[in-house]
A protein has these predicted regions:
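Long, hydrophobic/aromatic-enriched structural stretches that serve as scaffold segments
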Residues: 48-122
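Conserved aromatic-histidine-acidic binding/catalytic patches
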Residues: 14, 87-95, 130, 134-144, ...
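N-terminal ordered "arm"
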Residues: 2-68
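TerminUS-proximal long segments
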Residues: 21, 235-259
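Short loop/turn segments that flank or connect secondary-structure elements
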Residues: 104, 108-109, 115, 129, ...
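Intrinsically disordered, low-complexity regulatory segments enriched in Ser/Thr/Pro
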Residues: 62-91, 202-245
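Secondary-shell segments that build the walls of catalytic and ion/ligand-binding clefts
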Residues: 150-223
């Protein structure tokens, strides 16, 4: 079902910070399951998630036996899927120990390694300021941002297929919780070959609202680049987002929402 882009206007973007932080933290469970059971990929894509529009969930990479662990963002619940069933655990009010025990039990029952003790190679986001019970009305808005981003990036990915090696799959990265594609513009080592990252973040420490970004590599000199349209800016401060394009007041979504 196509995303109703106009619904992105239902919540003020700056009101989503707490719901986003809770969803970000919850997305670490699929990442832990992947890190515990998959061979590490050089780009960490083994721990990435993808948006499944049918389940309305961010799903981790497939594990042995067709198992996938994911997060239904709109209802804030962990899902555990096999080829024959889908089990779910509502996360509201659940301590990490209880969630970890539930997930470990599911994994071990399928002959997989437990995930709760897996140490991630980055700091897990804090949710000390957020209460899941107070964010029930805003979780669907976070889910809608991911659904809209996945749809738009999927279309954009098709338009960049003329390049070689070309665009990556649309992936959500649990470290920063952004969803993006990477368009490789030439063959060669990742640390030297030209590429462009294009993605959407639901918000982070730099911008407390969802935003769009374009991240060319190698990093260009902003003095040599043309002016950007209203609502966009060059932002060399961000650690992984050398060029960030915020979308305040929904300006960037106006034409898309009118489709």
């Amino acid at each position: 079902m196509p995303v109703s882009w106009s619904m992105l206007r239902n919540h003020a973007p700056t009101a989503l910070a707490a719901a986003r932080a809770l969803a970000h933290r919850a997305a670490q469970w699929p990442a832990r399951a992947a890190c515990a059971n998959l061979v590490p990929a050089p780009d960490d894509s083994h721990a990435s998630l993808s948006w499944d529009p049918d389940m309305a969930a961010l799903l981790g990479q497939p594990l042995d036996g067709g198992v996938r662990v994911g997060l239904r963002v709109a209802v804030h619940e962990l899902v555990f899927t096999t080829e024959s069933r889908c089990d779910a655990l509502p996360l509201t009010g659940k301590p990490d120990a209880e969630v970890g025990s539930w997930l470990d039990g599911k994994l071990v029952a399928e002959g997989l390694k437990p995930a709760s003790g897996t140490k991630l190679p980055y700091e897990v986001p804090s949710t000390m300021f957020a209460r899941a019970g107070e964010e029930a009305l805003r979780f669907p808005a976070i889910a809608l941002w991911f659904a809209a981003a996945a749809e738009a990036l999927g279309e954009l990915r098709q338009s960049y297929r003329r390049y070689t090696p070309g665009p990556s799959p649309v992936r959500c990265w649990p470290h920063h919780f952004d969803i993006a594609i990477l368009v490789a513009l030439e063959e060669g080592r990742a640390e030297s070959a030209r590429s462009i990252g294009i993605g959407v973040s639901p918000g982070d420490n730099y911008y407390a609202q969802p935003y769009l970004y374009v991240s060319p590599y190698p990093k260009p000199d902003t003095a040599d680049l043309p002016p950007l349209p209203p609502g966009a800016r060059y932002d060399p401060r961000a650690r992984i987002l050398p060029r960030t394009l915020p979308a305040p007041s929904w300006a960037v979504l106006t034409r898309r929402a009118a489709r």
